[in-house]
Design a protein with these regions (language model features):
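Membrane-interface interhelical connector segments
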Residues: 34-60
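Extended, low-polarity transmembrane helix blocks
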Residues: 1-37, 55, 66, 73, ...
Length: 166
C-alpha cells in the first residue's frame, strides 16, 4: 500500500489518467457531435431508453456528447477535476455493462457470433462497429484510470497540464 501511496504522491499516475481519459472522451464526444443521427441509432440499439416520448432519447443523443466533451476539457485543464472524474467514472460505469449486455444479446444471432468475443457491434462510442471484448477491456481500463483521477490524493498536476498554469 505504501508503494501505491508513494507513486500517487508523484502526481504522474494522475497526470497519465487525466490525459488518457480526457483525450479519449474528447475524441469520442466529438465523433458523436459530428454525427448525431448515427449516435441516436446506436442508442436505440441498446433498448435502454423509452422510444416514446421521443424527446428523451433525442435529448440524450444531443446532450451526452457535450457532457463528454465538457468532462474532457475539465480533465485536461484541471478545472473541476474531481467533478469531471466523477462524471466520467459514472458514465463508464453505465457504458461498460451496457456494451456487455448488448454483446450478450447478439451472441448466436449470426453464425459468426458464437461467443461474446466473436461479436462485432456498434457500441455507440462513435467509432462504428467494433469487437466487443477489446472494447470492454478498453472501457475497464478507462474506468480504472477515471477512478484514479477521482480518488487520487496527489496535489501535483491537479491544475493545468503545464505546471503553474491552470
Amino acid at each position: 500500500m505504501g508503494a501505491i501511496r508513494n507513486l500517487d504522491a508523484t502526481g504522474l499516475p494522475l497526470l497519465f489518467a487525466r490525459i488518457i481519459v480526457g483525450f479519449t472522451f474528447l475524441y469520442y464526444g466529438a465523433q458523436k457531435i459530428s454525427d448525431p443521427i448515427a449516435f441516436l441509432k446506436s442508442i436505440e440499439a441498446y433498448n435502454m431508453l423509452p422510444a416514446e416520448p421521443s424527446w428523451i432519447i433525442n435529448g440524450v443523443a444531443v446532450i451526452l456528447p457535450w457532457i463528454e466533451v465538457l468532462c474532457a476539457g475539465a480533465l485536461l485543464s484541471g478545472i473541476q477535476l474531481r467533478a469531471a472524474a466523477l462524471w466520467t467514472t459514472g458514465l463508464l460505469a453505465v457504458f461498460t455493462p451496457a456494451i456487455y449486455l448488448l454483446g450478450v444479446s447478439l451472441v448466436g444471432t449470426k453464425p459468426e457470433f458464437q461467443s461474446l468475443c466473436d461479436v462485432i457491434a456498434d457500441c455507440g462510442c462513435g467509432s462504428g462497429a467494433v469487437p466487443v471484448c477489446p472494447k470492454l477491456a478498453t472501457n475497464c481500463g478507462l474506468l480504472l484510470l477515471s477512478l484514479w483521477a477521482l480518488l487520487s490524493r496527489s496535489t501535483r498536476f491537479r491544475g493545468g497540464l503545464i505546471p503553474g498554469v491552470g
